């Protein structure tokens, strides 16, 4: 599947119920390492919350429309670690407002930094380094 403008217009049309603030492509498709059977990993920061079943339905509709399995992540509900991984390795495919995007990314990264500070004593007691830090 190609990531052409028409593809992203279809994605955005389908995501309209959650009023996306920013949409990221992550995983193998974000880095040109996908195979024919690779799924599409999308992360969305919604401007409007949806019930979990609505997210599930949205994921299914995206998969049907795009002809690939879609893994749809709601960034408002994702863990600090997953959000950081998406920011570190994902690509922004659409943003409604650059200021909102920048503010959210700063929040997500500071939340991850706070998590690392909070878990550092526990990991040190267990003799494990923080992810991304050498011993």
Model-identified regions with their sequence ranges:
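Catalytic core of pol beta-like nucleotidyltransferases
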Residues: 1-24, 31-35, 47-135
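Short hydrophobic/aromatic beta-strand micro-patches
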Residues: 43-45
């Amino acid at each position: 599947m190609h990531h052409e403008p028409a593809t992203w217009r279809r994605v955005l049309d389908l995501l309209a119920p959650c009023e996306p603030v920013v949409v990221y492509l992550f995983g193998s498709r974000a880095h040109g390492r996908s195979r024919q059977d690779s799924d599409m990993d999308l992360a969305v920061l919604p401007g409007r919350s949806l019930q979990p079943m609505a997210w599930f339905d949205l994921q299914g509709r995206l998969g049907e429309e795009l002809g690939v399995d879609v893994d749809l992540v709601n960034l408002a509900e994702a863990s600090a670690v997953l959000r950081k991984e998406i920011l570190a390795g994902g690509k922004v495919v659409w943003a409604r407002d650059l200021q909102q995007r920048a503010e959210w990314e700063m929040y997500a990264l500071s939340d991850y930094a706070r998590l690392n500070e909070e878990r550092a004593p526990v990991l040190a007691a267990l003799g494990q380094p923080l992810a991304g830090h050498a011993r």
